[in-house]
């Protein structure tokens, strides 16, 4: 059984997200617990928290398979101390929001050096922020998303993600989310069985499948190594359905949330069915 869903809307309140996920036949989902493009947000009310938990239970979706996404504004690698501190506080708030909702994961983009400091200095900033966030929170696993090598964003190669994990004090509370579009844009091929085996063999050697805590299943508008973060609907981009067939049938991938962030939400229900149909029956 694969746990497949999409990054659904939480418009009108986070409690609507499980309802929106159930409507498209999902048994996993992602959401923003606040406006992802604003620094401040109202605290979640007790009523909203209880309604979210009730709706999640009614949907039949486990909290294990919900992958909330942190704000895009957060940059834990920021070269400036004050800006980095602001990002850290916002990050901790995101973790606490996930925890209040009874969720166990928080997906985030690692950070950007803004062409002002070296890659290693930026990665060290990110690692220090992760450790501080872990120290000040509990229960929620922090899931680092790979990036597309666009601009000055780090986390685009597996070695950078491993560098962060190696510097985290509590490895039990850190994981990785592979975004297929980002991986492809950064030069990791997933299309053929051979290419997939090579890419995931490298992932396992450098990071380890045990850290794989979620995936974003997105086709890519541009070709291999484009360094462009442009998602496409499944089978309509440069990755093609073969890549997703490889993922769905990879026995080394555990019971993790597999989340669509494809560009046409009106066909998410169909895309979930496509992914389920790609799963080969085990003898």
From Swiss-Prot:
Binding annotation for Zn(2+) 3: 182, 229, 231
Domain of life: Bacteria
Ligand binding (Zn(2+) 1): 69, 109, 145
PROSITE patterns assigned to the protein according to its UniProt record, in alphabetical order: AP_NUCLEASE_F2_1, AP_NUCLEASE_F2_2, AP_NUCLEASE_F2_3, AP_NUCLEASE_F2_4
Binding site for Zn(2+) 2: 145, 179, 216, 261
E.C. numbers: 3.1.21.2
Swiss-Prot/TrEMBL catalytic activity: Endonucleolytic cleavage to 5'-phosphooligonucleotide end-products
UniProt cofactor(s): Zn(2+)
GO molecular function, one term: DNA binding
Cofactor binding note: Binds 3 Zn(2+) ions.
Keyword entries, A-Z: DNA damage, DNA repair, Endonuclease, Hydrolase, Metal-binding, Nuclease, Zinc
InterPro entries: AP_endonuc_2, AP_endonuc_F2_Zn_BS, Xyl_isomerase-like_sf, Xyl_isomerase-like_TIM-brl
GO biological process: base-excision repair
Its job: Endonuclease IV plays a role in DNA repair. It cleaves phosphodiester bonds at apurinic or apyrimidinic (AP) sites, generating a 3'-hydroxyl group and a 5'-terminal sugar phosphate.
NCBIfam families linked: nfo, PRK01060.1-4
Family according to the record: Belongs to the AP endonuclease 2 family.
UniProt-recorded name of the protein: Probable endonuclease 4
Gene name tied to this protein: nfo
């Amino acid at each position: 059984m694969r746990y497949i869903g999409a990054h659904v809307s939480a418009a009108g309140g986070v409690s609507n997200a499980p309802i929106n996920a159930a409507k498209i036949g999902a048994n996993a989902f992602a959401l923003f617990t606040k406006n992802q493009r604003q620094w401040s947000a109202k605290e979640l009310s007790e009523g909203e928290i209880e309604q979210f938990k009730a709706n999640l239970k009614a949907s039949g979706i486990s909290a294990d398979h919900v992958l909330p996404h942190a704000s895009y504004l957060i940059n834990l690698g920021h070269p400036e101390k004050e800006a980095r501190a602001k990002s850290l506080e916002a990050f901790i708030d995101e973790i606490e929001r996930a925890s209040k909702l009874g969720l166990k994961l928080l997906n985030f983009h690692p950070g950007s050096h803004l062409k002002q400091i070296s890659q290693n200095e930026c990665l060290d900033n990110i690692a220090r922020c992760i450790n501080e966030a872990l120290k000040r929170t509990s229960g929620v696993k922090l899931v680092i998303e790979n990036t597309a090598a666009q601009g000055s964003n780090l986390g685009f190669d597996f070695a950078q993600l491993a560098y962060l994990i190696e510097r985290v004090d509590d490895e039990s509370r850190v994981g990785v989310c592979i975004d297929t579009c980002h991986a492809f844009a950064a030069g990791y091929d997933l299309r053929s069985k051979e290419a997939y085996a090579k890419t995931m063999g490298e992932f396992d050697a450098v990071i380890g499948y045990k850290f794989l805590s979620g995936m974003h299943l997105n086709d890519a508008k541009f070709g291999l190594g484009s360094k462009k973060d442009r998602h496409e609907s499944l089978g309509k981009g440069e990755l093609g359905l073969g890549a997703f067939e490889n993922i769905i049938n990879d026995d080394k991938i555990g019971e993790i949330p597999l989340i669509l962030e494809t560009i046409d939400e009106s066909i998410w229900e169909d895309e979930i069915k496509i992914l389920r149909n790609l799963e080969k029956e085990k003898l």
